[in-house]
């Protein structure tokens, strides 16, 4: 397993993709990714939302914006990292995961919002298909990260959290960790 896993979000269109890209970020964070690069654009509303979640619920997830995707891919590969591109046209997820998990190199997971340029398919070490059918990038990312982390994300502790959700069969329970009970 790699020491670092980062998501590269391609094709984000402001304001059209705000909700879906927010969900890509939330999924990446909750399922154990270190951070997300939002390629080619800066979306301050998205950044504010994600940083607020990180502040309240903890963790060290980061978001970087505006970097041209070609540069992000080039820099990642030049530092010895590998790229897994999530697409309907790739190798089925179960077949790809053995090789992906066996490599200790940092991983960049590419998810698109609109048609992904052919260059991404060429640059990727793995073009990974979740079902070989049209699918939401949010669900594809969740499936990929679940297989990648082999379920370990379910016991992950998020450091410096202000709030913690307590599992409950009925109702909602949230504990404010900043309040002191004397």
Positions of predicted regions on the chain:
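Short, glycine/charged-enriched secondary-structure capping and boundary segments
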Residues: 21-23, 51-53, 97-101, 123-126, ...
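RNA substrate-binding interface of SAM-dependent RNA methyltransferases
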Residues: 1-88, 145, 149-154
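SAM-dependent methyltransferases
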Residues: 1-4, 30, 155-182
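Structured adenosyl-cofactor binding patch, chiefly the S-adenosyl-L-methionine
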Residues: 120-172
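Short, flexible active-site-adjacent loop segments at beta-strand->alpha-helix junctions, enriched
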Residues: 89-90, 169
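Long, charge-patterned amphipathic alpha-helical coiled-coil/hairpin "stalk" segments used as oligomerization
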Residues: 90-130
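Short, well-ordered alpha-helical microsegments
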Residues: 46-47, 69-73, 93-94, 117-118, ...
């Amino acid at each position: 397993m790699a020491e670092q896993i980062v998501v590269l979000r391609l094709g984000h269109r402001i304001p059209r993709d705000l909700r879906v890209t927010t969900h890509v970020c939330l999924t990446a964070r909750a399922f154990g990714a270190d951070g997300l690069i939002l390629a080619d654009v800066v979306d301050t509303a998205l950044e504010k939302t994600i940083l607020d979640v990180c502040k309240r619920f903890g963790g060290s997830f980061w978001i970087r914006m505006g970097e041209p995707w070609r540069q992000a891919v080039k820099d990642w590969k030049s530092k010895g990292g590998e790229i897994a591109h999530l697409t309907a046209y790739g190798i089925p997820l179960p077949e790809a995961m053995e090789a992906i998990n066996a490599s200790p190199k940092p991983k960049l997971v590419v998810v698109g919002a609109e048609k992904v340029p052919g260059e991404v398919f060429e640059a990727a070490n793995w073009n990974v298909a979740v079902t070989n059918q049209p699918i939401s990038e949010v669900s594809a990312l969740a499936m990929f990260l679940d297989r990648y982390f082999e379920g370990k994300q379910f016991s992950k502790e998020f450091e410096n959290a202000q709030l913690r959700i307590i599992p409950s069969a009925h109702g909602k329970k949230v504990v404010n960790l900043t309040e002191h009970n004397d």
